[in-house]
Regions:
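NAD(P)+-binding Rossmann beta1-loop-alpha1 motif at the extreme N-terminus of oxidoreductases
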Residues: 1-63, 122
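Hydrophobic beta-strand scaffold residues
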Residues: 27, 47, 113-114, 155, ...
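Amphipathic alpha-helical hairpins
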Residues: 15, 53, 60, 66, ...
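Helical "substrate-binding/catalytic lid" subdomain
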Residues: 164-280
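Rossmann-fold dinucleotide-binding core
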Residues: 94-177
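Anion (oxyanion) recognition and catalysis
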Residues: 21, 41, 107, 149, ...
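Rossmann-fold NAD(P) dinucleotide-binding segment
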Residues: 51-112
Length: 282
């Protein structure tokens, strides 16, 4: 039975702890807001007063914290109490730059560290499903593969480049935000046209554009802008979208229209829609 410390028991961290307790791990928890940690006592968790108290004697330490600054603060607080051989696994959605800067400091202090952000909701964490991205030393990954696999549906090892998982996590989250913004703009058009939002969404029961991330994205990454949907024609459709909203506030489409105009002005009008990436893909 593993002895685990878990620092940061908010929505996601608390759900991860629930899953660990169900699997039989001994878990000591700490949270800046103590009440969130205390809520896990009834399930069998032990609550520590400080990060150092939490990690003392633990075989592995998991973290799900708000941001890079707090990660650095908490790691500095518990490092003197960390058991020899303990492995620190950070599930925080942290910046690639912050993670890259953090790793040499941890190495110098003798801390064994993996960065392992996740794509999962709290309920997915309870049910041990979802996707976990892992970056860090191969030997540490191999040692932790079994317990990490128990936490999620799939573990994707991205190699020893320590900030790669952080980068991939924000790439993925960016698409979540784009989808939410795009749906908002669909609702704006629907409102302008007098169509209920729930009705507007039914188009996506038949037309499912998610596959274009791979299909068009591959071409864009290679700077292959041979047209299957000419940018100047896409810009015409964009005009129809903006007009349909009849002045309703929109989140993302006006910015895309601006990027289209800039690309057309640079001579990409007869290229593919993906040519809006020409300025950033070299």
């Amino acid at each position: 039975m593993a002895s685990v410390a878990f620092l940061g028991t908010g929505l996601l961290g608390g759900a991860m702890v629930e899953g660990m307790l169900r699997r039989g791990d001994q878990v000591t928890v700490w949270n800046r807001t103590e009440a969130k940690a205390r809520a896990l006592e009834a399930l069998g968790a032990k609550v520590a007063a400080t990060p150092g108290d939490a990690v003392a004697g633990a075989d592995r330490v998991h973290m799900t914290l708000p941001d890079d600054a707090i990660v650095d603060q908490i790691v500095a607080a518990f490092t003197p109490r960390l058991a020899a051989g303990a492995i620190v696994i950070d599930h925080t959605t942290a910046s690639p730059q912050g993670t890259k800067a953090r790793i040499p400091r941890l190495n110098a202090a003798g801390v064994k560290f993996l960065h392992a952000p996740v794509f999962m909701s709290p309920q997915m964490a309870r049910d041990s499903i979802g996707l976990m991205l892992v970056s860090g030393p191969q030997a540490l990954y191999d040692a932790m593969l079994a317990p990490l696999s128990a936490m999620t549906g799939e573990v994707w090892y991205l190699g020893e480049e320590g900030d790669r998982a952080a980068a991939y996590k924000i790439f993925g989250n960016s698409m979540l935000f784009v989808i939410a913004a795009g749906v908002t703009d669909v609702f704006a058009m629907a409102k302008g046209l007098g169509i209920p939002a729930t009705d507007a969404l039914t188009v996506f029961s038949k037309f499912q554009p998610g596959g274009l991330i791979k299909a068009r994205g591959d071409k864009m990454a290679r700077r292959d802008f041979s047209a299957t949907f000419e940018l100047k024609m896409a810009r015409k459709d964009m005009r129809l979208m903006l007009e349909a909203a009849t002045g309703q506030p929109m989140v993302v489409l006006p910015g895309i229209a601006k990027a289209m105009d800039e690309a057309i002005a640079k001579g990409h009008g007869q290229d593919d829609l993906g040519a809006i990436a020409a300025a950033v893909v070299k």
